[in-house]
Amino acid sequence: MDAWPRCLERLEAEFPPEDVHTWLKPLQAEDRGDSIVLYAPNAFIVDQVRERYLPRIRELLAYFAGNGEVALAVGSRPRAPEPAPAPVAATIAPQAAPIAPFAGNLDSHYTFANFVEGRSNQLGLAAAIQAAQKPGDRAHNPLLLYGSTGLGKTHLMFAAGNALRQAKPAAKVMYLRSEQFFSAMIRALQDKAMDQFKRQFQQIDALLIDDIQFFAGKDRTQEEFFHTFNALFDGRQQIILTCDRYPREVEGLEPRLKSRLAWGLSVAIDPPDFETRAAIVLAKARERGAEIPDDVAFLIAKKMRSNVRDLEGALNTLVARANFTGRSITVEFAQETLRDLLRAQQQAIGIPNIQKTVADYYGLQMKDLLSKRRTRSLARPRQVAMALAKELTEHSLPEIGDAFAGRDHTTVLHACRQIRTLMEADGKLREDWEKLIRKLSE
């Protein structure tokens, strides 16, 4: 079928070359008329495609082939019989390309049941559940989930959409990435089909858009989204959005759009703590049918601190090598397999780097951050830096104290507790913390 090569060409433009080469190019497509089957050489590739690429593949095949029903299977595409010579057909005038349809393309894999709850995401989980149970309620419409990449925002978005459709099977839930909204709008402008573009949003029950920070600087896109937002909000249709930061901090977003986004509920999704990271590793391992000892999960959770996606990447690497070599997964095997990955994590985040990042963020000189002065403008950033050192490195409290001009370990402990307590009530401090985590994880 010629739709799959066109789909693959689009995927090559959207995803890193190594991802396309590893997970997507091995796929073989078979058109069965009412569905399309993608064959993969092994179950591991099937799992990766289902988890990471299937929603986008469905959308592209629906556009290029008019068929978004996609199944994944292990094996090879059946050999087709030799076709009979085709008669010469009359020339058919080409038709204008249709606007890519916004058919429901939620990934059913992502549910509330398989979302691992922790202190960093429990408010976001509760808000997403409420949005699914009471769609359109002004208390959480729009629902905006913001935070660094790979923390579970899209999982919660999909879970809310899936829960909404489970409760109301006829519900029309539309999921888009922000660049898809932009591309479809540009295509509609080129084809003089803006009325058709706008009608797509009139009959839906919920609109889910990922990564709205990419609307920044695109004035016409923001104009269309602004009107779409107003129509959905007035019709009490649920809107769920994600962003990599608090929207008011996104330069290039129009003030009126920022104002609309603040109408409902905005919830930060923070990096997971150690316990949550360990639980995520164990949960993901169970999904893959892999036996991961607790001490291996603890090792990964201790070393991989930035986001859930990195945890999954480490787990995937571990499981793949175990499958290829036939070896059991032990702490020693994990340390050997993940050696370079773990070393890179440790080198990326150290106490000196944390101190410099915090000093730059708050506009301080390093000597002032490390000084004995206790003015509030210095004490709070210093406490933040100590708490980050405790959160992101393996250094002990005494070692952290030594790095901060020889302070006692009890001072470090107090700083960690103080910052954790303050973040529960101080939204600005929580945002500072999240930004610093993001900077240190880049």
Swiss-Prot record:
Region Domain IV, binds dsDNA, annotated ranges: 323-442
GO BP term, pick one: DNA replication initiation
Subcellular location per the Swiss-Prot or TrEMBL entry: Cytoplasm
Gene Ontology molecular function terms on file: ATP binding; ATP hydrolysis activity; DNA replication origin binding; lipid binding
Segments of this protein annotated with the region Domain II: 75-104
Residues the record lists as binding ATP: 150, 152-154
GO cellular component, one term: plasma membrane
InterPro entries per the UniProt record, alphabetical: AAA+_ATPase, Chromosome_initiator_DnaA, Chromosome_initiator_DnaA-like, Chromosome_initiator_DnaA_CS, DnaA_C, DnaA_dom, DnaA_N_dom, DnaA_N_sf
Region (Domain III, AAA+ region): 105-322
Keywords linked to the UniProt accession: ATP-binding, Cytoplasm, DNA replication, DNA-binding, Lipid-binding, Nucleotide-binding
Pfam families, per database record: Bac_DnaA, Bac_DnaA_C, DnaA_N
Keyword Cytoplasm applies: yes
SMART domains for this protein: AAA, Bac_DnaA_C
Region described as Domain I, interacts with DnaA modulators: 1-75
The keyword DNA-binding is annotated on this UniProt entry: yes
Sequence similarity: Belongs to the DnaA family.
Domain notes: Domain I is involved in oligomerization and binding regulators, domain II is flexibile and of varying length in different bacteria, domain III forms the AAA+ region, while domain IV binds dsDNA.
Subunit structure: Oligomerizes as a right-handed, spiral filament on DNA at oriC.
PANTHER family in UniProt: CHROMOSOMAL REPLICATION INITIATOR PROTEIN DNAA (PTHR30050:SF2)
Function: Plays an essential role in the initiation and regulation of chromosomal replication. ATP-DnaA binds to the origin of replication (oriC) to initiate formation of the DNA replication initiation complex once per cell cycle. Binds the DnaA box (a 9 base pair repeat at the origin) and separates the double-stranded (ds)DNA. Forms a right-handed helical filament on oriC DNA; dsDNA binds to the exterior of the filament while single-stranded (ss)DNA is stabiized in the filament's interior.
Protein name stated in the entry: Chromosomal replication initiator protein DnaA
Organism: Xanthomonas oryzae pv. oryzae (strain PXO99A)
Designated gene of the protein: dnaA
